[in-house]
UniProtKB/Swiss-Prot annotation:
Segments for region (ATPase domain C-terminus): 246-369
The record's free-text note on cofactor binding: Probably binds 2 metal cations. In vitro during a short incubation, Mn(2+) is most efficient on linear or supercoiled dsDNA, nicks but only poorly digests dsDNA with Co(2+), Ni(2+) or Zn(2+). When purified from E.coli Ca(2+) and Mg(2+) are the most abundant metals.
Family designation: Belongs to the class 1 OLD nuclease family.
Protein name: OLD nuclease
Designated gene of the protein: old
Reaction(s) catalysed (UniProt annotation): Exonucleolytic cleavage in the 5'- to 3'-direction to yield nucleoside 5'-phosphates
Species, as recorded: Thermus scotoductus (strain ATCC 700910 / SA-01)
Lineage of producing organism: Bacteria, Thermotogati, Deinococcota, Deinococci, Thermales
Length: 528
């Protein structure tokens, strides 16, 4: 598994150092450097051996400055052992002057040094050594040709390795061509084919059941003399058969998801897979399916998944340990923010207190793509915020402000922790939810009210402690009460919106002033 990436002077990456986990989601705005990070890993460990032809000179040098050497170091674990040497990283450099450039790929030991033999000669990176940490890179094009068995290191190539051994036992292939195709379709081939076809059809289900009935996805062999290197996925509809790589990118993407599902079901280990924008060409339901599939494969140690994304489905605040937020600072340098090891335990405790239902709302993940965030307690509060933005003549989308329904106060704690770890500026507004005790009630009811008030006070204190008092605005006792809406009223969001339309935001009622001030603050420039 890859553990760490260091990049210097490659394209827009002047100097970054980021940890890599079993599942790593690289998020950030367009042009921040997400794809460059993936390309850096692919240069060192991808399908093509790195050489001078791997680089564009001077375009791949930062600011086109060829005097600053490109250096990409990828660390991995477990180490590769060769004799007495333990190799834990590879370093790729491209440097030179006066048009005399050269590229070096060097192995590094635990101390970050190139090991040397007793003779003084340095250890060199060989094919076996590089294959120890090799990665499979899937770019945004989703071309099925990337996955065919003829492509070195492809997913289907790895899936079919045991099938090749099984097929070698069939010694009459050359004698009877008519029987050859049946012989090629061993039980494992059939199982792989079935899984890919069923998953792809599931991904394409939005076309309708009638369309699915006339569609088949399966294997075809382009060259019977070299069956498994020429195996390809075919798409059959009515009497028409087409190679999979001739189809639209949406169908090809669905078939790619099917290939991953086949790997998951067979329990095979892939190594490290790098995916550029896994959401590409998939509708939302298919995106959620693919995301769960990737998470399960990473959780079960079938493979390491590293991907870039613009989708709130694939950027999940509940998996905060996987997030790497890439942005440019005021000096136009790329910086990467992530949850540090020392903060993970506290955030994990908050996550465990989070309401289960709130964990499945991908809308709150939009906070990861915002320049600033207004964190509110629930859906009604979000409706109120959007209505007040409108009355203040501020477009939150145009200002890249996320209005986030956190799903309760525990959710606010979680999102605040993630925002702080990733340096996302934020403001919080929530209800106090501390109500006067009804002295006319019986003792048991009063005791229950006191316990509820105490619990809310503790929640409020935790929010203020984690967010900072200057970022927290509290409506007393609640937004509904401030607007004259009963605690048990029905259709609260609609009532909130209708009443707020009549509010003068220039001179709001005192009870509503904290909410308006929170919105005013989040619209101002804020320090990260």
């Amino acid at each position: 598994m890859l553990k760490r990436l260091q990049v210097k002077n490659f394209r827009c990456l002047e100097d970054i150092d980021l940890p890599l986990g079993p599942l790593t989601a690289i998020v950030g705005p367009n042009g921040a450097g997400k794809t460059t990070i993936l390309r850096a890993i692919d240069l060192v460990l991808g399908d093509v051996w790195p050489s001078l032809r791997s680089f564009r000179i001077p375009q791949d040098f930062i600011n086109f400055d060829t005097t600053r050497a490109i250096e990409i170091t990828v660390h991995f674990d477990p180490p590769y052992t060769q004799g007495s040497f333990n190799i834990t990283a590879f370093r790729l450099t491209c440097k030179g002057e006066d048009a005399d450039f050269h590229v070096d790929l060097e192995p590094l030991d635990e101390g970050g040094n190139v090991p040397r033999y007793p003779s003084g000669n340095p250890l060199r990176v060989g094919t076996d050594m590089r294959n120890h940490a090799r990665v499979l890179f899937l770019d945004h094009r989703r071309n099925l040709a990337q996955h065919l068995p003829s492509i070195r290191g492809s997913i289907l190539g790895r899936l079919l390795q045991p099938v090749r051994r099984e097929f070698k036992l069939q010694d009459n292939f050359k004698q009877v061509y008519e029987q050859a195709m049946d012989l090629l379709r061993t039980e494992q081939v059939k199982q792989i084919e079935k899984t890919i076809a069923e998953t792809a059809k599931q991904m394409l289900g939005f076309l309708g059941k009638d369309a699915m009935k006339s569609m088949e996805i399966g294997f075809g062999f382009a060259d019977p003399a070299n069956p498994f290197n020429s195996l390809r996925l075919q798409y059959r509809e009515s009497d028409l058969t087409l190679p999979g790589d001739e189809l639209g990118l949406g169908i090809q993407s669905a078939i790619v998801v099917g290939i991953f599902e086949a790997f998951r079901q067979l329990g095979e280990k892939i190594g490290t897979v790098i995916i550029e924008e896994p959401e590409m060409y998939l509708h939302p339901q298919a995106q959620r399916y693919f995301y769960r599939l990737l998470c399960e494969m990473a959780d079960k140690d079938q493979c390491q998944i590293i991907y870039s994304t613009h989708s709130p489905i694939f950027a999940d605040v509940n998996r905060f340990e996987a997030l790497r937020l890439v942005r440019k600072d005021r000096d136009d340098r790329v910086v990467v923010s992530y949850v540090r090891e020392e903060d993970k335990s506290a955030l994990d405790n908050v996550r465990n207190r989070f309401k289960l239902g709130g964990r499945f709302d991908t809308a709150r993940n939009e906070v990861l793509f915002a320049k600033r965030a207004l964190l509110v307690e629930g859906y009604g509060d979000r409706v109120a915020a959007l209505q007040l933005f409108n009355q203040l003549e501020v477009d939150p989308d145009a200002e890249c402000i996320a209005v986030v329904d956190c799903g309760g106060k525990a959710g606010i704690e979680l999102i605040v922790g993630v925002c702080k770890a990733l340096d996302i500026p934020f403001v919080v507004v929530h209800d106090e939810d501390v109500w006067p005790i009804d002295e006319r009630a019986d003792e048991e009811t009063r005791r229950k009210q006191e316990q509820e008030n105490k619990a809310e006070q503790e929640k409020n204190q935790r929010i203020q402690a984690c967010a900072g008092a200057e970022r927290v605005f509290v409506v007393q006792p609640s937004l509904e009460a401030a607007l004259g809406i009963g605690r048990n009223a029905s259709d609260k969001p609609y009532r909130i919106a209708e009443i707020l339309k009549t509010v003068d935001v220039g001179q709001p009622p005192d009870a509503l002033r904290p909410f308006v001030e929170a919105i005013r603050q989040v619209t101002r420039p804020m320090e990260e």
